[in-house]
Structure formats: structure tokens, C-alpha cells
Regions:
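Short alpha-helical interface elements
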Residues: 47, 73-75, 339
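P-loop NTPase Walker A phosphate-binding motif
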Residues: 42-61
Length: 340
């Protein structure tokens, strides 16, 4: 599973489009702000792949420079690092916006051929950089020169400015992207039959949500995770985990129970008909074979001449349905019996 981050950032639709949009925006001469949450998966790999996309888009025209966000004066930092001494000597600090106006108007500075990537900015630092970048593009008046990629946290509160677009990882990547990734990873790397792999993917999706990096670790552990999810989900309460397990089982197990019921009724329809109408202990009467639920069939056919294996299967499926119907969860052993 060494290449699992590559699958996420290159093949999963939402994640790939997130990087493509950023790269296209920057290649078009605009700047970008990317908002990343604490759950943004494989951050270093994301940066590496995005840099690769950018280099292909730039085609050698622009160089990417990593810049520290930790500065009180972004304009002065850019001025000091991307202007030659001769250019600096011509600068006259005439007002608050003098630095940024000077940078936007000069045609002979390294900034014009650069993409400045500002990483790990706090909210306060990001606000200063965003204001500087927006002013820079305003003074450019539509011309294409230097561009900026500002990386900050998910709690960003600003909106797009002219030629400065904000991209949010949480907005661009959906629950379905995470689910599709989990299904793919479980199918490729999980163990067991197709039902067990699907169950693993569903349960991981229901317990880890958008935290796909944690989800991938759970899938990697496979059977150990299915036996004891709480061991891998320290940040989830017992109630949250039980609810996720029940939701997963309801989605996957209930249809299989209904398929079993229909097949069972079809196989034993003459025998069932011979016992009808049948009054249950609840007072409910069964008049047709297809009206009988699993528990009803167990009552109707009790003591009849059924194949032992079929009788055991009926009991297993009846018990499973009763548990799920009463908001209880099945053990992994119970689930595997149904899948079998």
C-alpha cells in the first residue's frame, strides 16, 4: 500500500480535480489560496504532486519558490528577495502601498517569472498575505506577472478577489470521493470475499468520514479492524461506533436477509402452504407463503421435515433480522455467516 496516496491524489475524482483546478488557475496567471483542514490526507504527497502538475503547466516559464508565512510585512519580504540591488535602489517608500505598487509595476524583477508558494500560514498571517496578493493583482491591472499560492487552514473566512481564487479542500472533496476511495482500496488490498471487502469499505466510510488517511489505515488492518473497530477509532465514542456498525449492517445485511427469505419460501412453498392459514402467537394470521417473514417461517415450519442445514440457516437469518430490527448489531462471526 506504499502508493496509496498516489491513488487518492491522482485517481479519485474530487481530489484530482482539486489539484487540477489549482494548477489551471495558477497557469492562467491568477493566484490561489488553498484551504486545508487537519484531515487533509498525505499533505507532503499532495504538495509534491501539485508541484509536479504546476511544473508541467508552467513548462519552465515560471520557477516555484517556497516562502515562509512568518513575516509581518509580506510586501517587504518579496521586495527583499525578488528584486536586484539595482532595482531596490530605485524604490522610494512614498506610502502604505508603495511596496506592492512598485512590485506590480516593475518589468525587470525575478518576481515576474515566479510562483511564490507560502505554506502553513496561520489565520493572521494568511490575512496579511491575502491582502498583499489582492493589492498586487489590483495594481497589475490584468497584466500577467508573478503569481502566489497561499496555503492556510480550513477556517479561512475570506472570499475570492479579482485574480485571486480560494480553493477549499473540504468543499471540493465529497463524502462520495472518500467512499469511492475506500471501496477501491478495500477491493485492491483487503482480504476475504467481495462481501467482506464491501462491508469493510462501508464500515470504514461510516466511521472515518472525510479522514481518508485514517480510513486507509483501518482498511490496511482489515480483519483486525472488523473484529474490534474501537481499537482503531480512539476519537469515537462507543455509541458512535455502534451506530456506524448498525447502519452499515442494515444497508448490507438486510437485502441479503430478504433474498434468503424469498429463496427459502420458493424452495418450501408447498410445505408452507400445507400449514396455512397459520395464526402466530401475536394473533396475526398468515394466509400466503410470501406474507411470512423469517420469524414467521420459523414458527410455521417448526417441527416440520426440513433439511437440517436449511433449518440452521433459517435460524441464523431470523436471529440476524431480529437483532437489526431492534437496533442491535451483529458480531463479525454473525456477519460472515450471512455472507457465506
Amino acid at each position: 500500500m506504499d502508493d496509496i496516496s498516489e491513488i487518492w491524489w491522482r485517481q479519485i475524482t474530487g481530489a484530482r480535480k482539486f489539484l487540477d483546478k489549482i494548477a489551471d488557475n495558477l497557469a492562467g496567471g491568477k493566484s490561489a489560496v488553498i484551504c486545508l483542514s487537519e484531515k487533509t490526507p498525505w499533505l507532503d504527497d499532495m504538495r509534491r504532486i501539485l508541484r509536479e502538475f504546476l511544473n508541467k503547466k508552467f513548462g519552465g516559464i515560471k520557477a516555484i519558490h517556497r516562502i515562509s508565512a512568518a513575516t509581518d510585512e509580506p510586501a517587504q519580504l518579496v521586495f527583499e528577495n525578488f528584486c536586484s540591488d539595482n532595482v531596490k535602489a530605485e524604490f522610494i517608500p512614498f506610502g502604505e502601498k508603495a511596496w506592492v505598487k512598485f512590485l506590480a509595476e516593475r518589468d525587470d524583477i525575478n518576481l515576474n517569472n515566479s510562483c511564490l508558494w507560502i505554506r502553513d500560514a496561520t489565520a493572521a498571517q494568511a490575512s496579511k498575505w491575502f491582502a498583499f496578493i489582492a493589492d498586487y493583482h489590483k495594481y497589475l491591472r490584468g497584466r500577467r506577472k508573478g503569481i502566489f499560492l497561499l496555503e492556510t487552514g480550513a477556517d479561512w473566512g475570506m472570499t475570492d478577489k479579482a485574480d485571486v481564487e480560494i480553493f477549499s479542500c473540504e468543499r471540493e472533496i465529497s463524502d462520495y470521493d472518500c467512499f469511492a476511495f475506500n471501496v477501491f482500496i478495500a477491493a485492491e488490498f483487503g482480504k476475504g470475499d467481495k462481501f467482506t471487502k464491501r462491508y469493510l469499505a462501508e464500515l470504514v466510510s461510516n466511521t472515518t468520514g472525510l479522514d481518508v488517511e485514517s480510513g486507509a489505515e483501518c482498511i490496511k488492518c482489515g480483519g483486525d479492524f472488523l473484529k474490534n473497530p474501537r481499537r482503531f477509532l480512539k476519537n469515537k465514542s462507543k455509541e458512535e461506533i455502534e451506530r456506524a456498525i448498525w447502519t452499515t449492517q442494515l444497508k448490507l445485511i438486510f437485502p441479503l436477509l430478504e433474498i434468503f427469505r424469498r429463496d427459502f419460501v420458493k424452495k418450501y412453498e408447498p410445505l408452507i402452504k400445507s400449514q396455512l392459514p397459520f395464526e402466530l402467537s401475536s394473533g396475526k394470521k398468515i394466509y400466503a407463503p410470501d406474507e411470512a417473514e423469517l420469524g414467521d417461517l420459523y414458527s410455521i415450519l417448526g417441527g416440520q421435515n426440513l433439511q437440517q442445514e436449511d433449518w440452521e440457516e433459517l435460524k441464523i437469518h431470523r436471529d440476524a433480522r431480529n437483532k437489526l430490527a431492534h437496533l442491535s448489531t451483529l458480531t463479525l462471526e454473525d456477519v460472515q455467516k450471512i455472507f457465506k
